[in-house]
Amino acid sequence: NTIETAAPVIRDRHMTVQPQPHMVRDVTQVAHAAKLRDHEIIDARAAARFRGEAPEPRQGLRAGHIPGSKNLPFTQLLNGDHTMKTIPEMAGEFQKAGVDLSKPAITTCGSGVTAAVLSLALERIGKKDHSLYDGSWTEWGQFPTLNVATGDS
């Protein structure tokens, strides 16, 4: 590898942002999907947090996960050097987590950040019908009217 020492050339670029509302879900949509079980809800948090065995880093949140969701910690999609695994390896991780890729997917995590790693992996393996719940556990875990599951399922 060569390290360049020259100053970078900075150029103006134009980019037009196209909103993609179908790629984001809110708490009402996720609650509906959890009730109907017509989507795969995939949680990127560590297994202990998903199972409700580890305390939540945000005060006042219940421990556990969205009922019916599957756990695939985002770190399982990464190599030791923090690059993403190969497409076949990532597809295998979704399969090992019990994710039914024939259903539309909703990714979630603690606050909507690491769920994006799951969404990127889904996109890379060719799955187009996925969305991200950006409220994630920070939102779900604070509402006493929403059910919470613990354990592996």
PLM features: residue spans?
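Rhodanese-like catalytic fold shared by cysteine-dependent sulfurtransferases
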Residues: N1-E40, A44-S153
